[in-house]
Amino acid sequence: MALKLPKGTQFGFAPVVSTAIATSSISKAAPALASVAANSVDTGDVVVIELPGWPALNNRATRAGAEATGTVELLGIDTTDTVLFPGTSGAGVLRKAGAFVDLDQQGDPTTAGGEQQYWSGTLLEDPTGRQVQLPTFKNAKTITLPLFYDPKKPWYSALKNVDAKGEPVILRAKLVGGDVLYWYGYLSYNGDPTMAANAPMGTTATFTALADSILVEGA
């Protein structure tokens, strides 16, 4: 049994550097290896992957692991499934995260979306008229982050700036024990404080993911 409580989790976010780092291919391995120019990606860099040839990996964010000549590990990524990752990856691009801004004075986050949707119907030849369902798409995932109002905090102006630009960012959740989750998507922020008697004023950041998270496990 390994129950884990979220107490101590800290969210943060970072802009994405516009400079594109070409990758000629990504291997089928766990963790996957990206072929890049020597010294273009360092161990510990957080990167977004743009890889049209493997849609299951496109728009996902992770941390770079060990480097070797011309390759770097993409931690938390397993590309050995030949259904999800058929053939070869083809060329793509990595983009590094800028400096992360950590959030504090956090309330309890809430998540929504990700629910599987279905097509429902019956088959004409089935005399029982039994209904069948086929999975279609999943709803977009959102994370809502309550933040207690304090305009002097570094994150306040940084969130306002990100909201105004409307550009995708990398969201990070540092969990107790060293595990880290990374997402890539859009972050909006309402900096106007909520007001209720005998309660701290609050603001709300809302993140919409462009792809599933990547979990990088702690040592």
Give the positions of each predicted feature.
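Small/polar beta-strand repeat architecture
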Residues: 3-7, 15-29, 38-39, 53-128
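Oligomerization/assembly interface segments of phage tail-like spikes and tubes
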Residues: 121, 132-151, 199-214
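Residues that flank catalytic or metal-binding motifs in active/ligand-binding sites
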Residues: 60, 141, 167, 183, ...
